[in-house]
Amino acid sequence: MAAPNISFASVTLDCPNQEELADFYVALLGWRKERFDEEWLAVISPDSHICLLFQETDDYVPPVWPNEEGKQQQMTHLDFAASPKDKEAVKSHALACGASLASVQYFESSTVFIDPVGHPFCISFFG
């Protein structure tokens, strides 16, 4: 049986404040912000239909990365890509936008950051 046509739409990040986290990703990526309704705020790529959605939760607990036993674990993380020639500029930009550098880095070709509410994300430098 052939699979029905299902396309990727978005990644949703829980957070304590939609506006603040969306503003961080707008600054980081240069994407546009759009409110779908009272509950959903999106940051949308200008190059495709892909978007990040932000959902406020009253009991938000930031994930701990790397994992620590007994602490909130990450459920997923975002991966972005940039040119190796722009590595230092991209890292400086991410930090200026409000990201922090993760305490553990596993690969030379990728840098792990933590967004303002604790979600880890990577920027890989290939090309």
Say what each PLM segment does.
Residues M1-A9, L13-R35, S45-S100, I114-G127:
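Glyoxalase I/VOC metalloenzyme domain signal
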Residues Y106-E108:
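Short, small/polar residue-rich loop motifs at catalytic or cofactor-binding pockets
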